[in-house]
Amino acid sequence: MELIKKIQDRDAAEKAYYDVIEPYSELLEFSFHKEFVSEEKVTQRTASSDSLNTIASENNDENVINLEEFRQLKRNCDLYQRNLQKLQLLFKQQSQKNTLLEKQLSLQTELNQEKDKRVKILQDELWALQLEVAALERKSPNA
């Protein structure tokens, strides 16, 4: 029963890791997409150098804001990558622990089966001895 509880706890822990990792993965993908779109905008603006000369200061302010937003997204992306790596390591460690517990459970199950067989043999021997004692008791008062 204790091993079943451990396995259930393990399954709950794995689900918790998955629930944490999945949003980070989605956010990471979103950040990369956002970074790609921002880089495309920068590339398009750089390619059209004639139009860059005519951009108003309002557009320059927008570029500064976009650049700051890009930097913030990059920092967030790096943070999420580190957290994801840590979670992957924890998940790997937990998986190894779960594998070990499964092996222990398997061995314990085999051991219990062997013990059950031995108990059955001992019970059969006990019954045989009890029958023999009963037979001897029946013979001795008659003799």
Curated annotation (Swiss-Prot):
GO terms for biological process: macroautophagy; meiotic cell cycle; protein transport. Residues 66-142 form a coiled coil. It is found in: Cytoplasm; Preautophagosomal structure membrane. GO terms for cellular component: cytoplasm; cytosol; phagophore assembly site; phagophore assembly site membrane. Disruption phenotype: Impairs atg8-processing. It is a peripheral membrane protein. Keywords: Autophagy, Cell cycle, Coiled coil, Cytoplasm, Meiosis, Membrane, Protein transport, Transport. Homodimer. Interacts with atg5. Stabilizes the atg5-atg12 conjugate and mediates the formation of the 350 kDa complex, which is necessary for autophagy. The atg5-atg12/atg16 complex is required for efficient promotion of atg8-conjugation to phosphatidylethanolamine and atg8 localization to the preautophagosomal structure (PAS). Involved in endoplasmic reticulum-specific autophagic process and is essential for the survival of cells subjected to severe ER stress. Required for meiotic chromosome segregation. Belongs to the ATG16 family. This is Autophagy protein 16. The gene is atg16.
